[in-house]
Regions:
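Membrane-proximal intracellular helices of multi-pass ion channels
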Residues: 1-221
Length: 221
């Protein structure tokens, strides 16, 4: 699911870069089409940077989850903690929704730190590489204090639309799930649990397909 999540074109191009092979004009045109870019210039550097950013999020998320699983006692052996930690991180970033247990992430249904971590990684993997690159440029601008053309960095229109669309759908989905399931799935649950669960399903149903309840428990009307 790593190949399916990041894209065969991105991964194959990155290995071309590692092997110092020249990427032909035809290959660059295919990459441009695959990534929906308007121009050829900088396309290889874009893939390299995006690939490294996504892999970095997977690695950092995997390490944090692994140590968290071991410290909190989910797994006794480090090997199991690392395997499951990295698997969950990669699955979240690639928005694949796969699991190795047969019951998704139901054991973590009330583990709020883990759920927020999963939601963040799903967001990173689903928001799109143009938005990620835009935020990267903004962060570099803030850290280096270098202003392009002596004005503060401005996000592109695409980034603004993508981010606010995600935010609107996230809030609307959370509120909808909260009120629809308040007297059904959430009956007897704490307000905190109801809120976090609503947020989680608002995120995961749009991209990742992970679940922390048996879907048969949801109301059907």
């Amino acid at each position: 699911f790593q190949v399916g999540g990041l894209g065969i074109m991105m991964i194959s191009t990155f290995f071309f870069i590692l092997s110092n092979k020249r990427i032909s004009l035809k290959q660059r045109q295919l990459i441009m089409t695959d990534m929906n870019q308007p121009r050829l210039s900088g396309i290889v550097n874009l893939i390299r940077t995006t690939f490294l950013i996504l892999i970095s999020f997977q690695a950092i998320g995997g390490l944090l989850f692994s140590f968290y699983f071991k410290v909190t006692g989910y797994y006794d052996r480090w090997s199991d903690a690392f395997f499951n930690g990295f698997y969950q991180a990669i699955s979240a970033v690639t928005n694949s929704g796969f699991d190795v247990t047969g019951h998704s992430i139901l054991p973590y249904s009330t583990d709020y730190p883990f759920l927020f971590g999963i939601m963040f990684l799903i967001f990173i993997g689903g928001i799109g590489f143009p938005v990620i690159m835009d935020f990267r440029s903004w962060l570099i601008d803030k850290l280096t204090k270098k202003k392009l053309h002596q004005i503060p960095y401005r996000f592109s229109l695409f980034t603004k639309i993508a981010f606010f669309s995600f935010l609107i759908l996230f809030v609307a989905g959370t509120i909808t799930i909260f009120f629809l399931e308040r007297n059904h799935l959430f009956q007897g649950a704490s307000l905190l649990n109801q809120g976090v669960t609503s947020m989680f399903y608002s995120v995961t149903t749009r991209n990742a397909g992970l679940q922390i309840h048996d879907l048969n428990e949801f109301q059907t009307t």
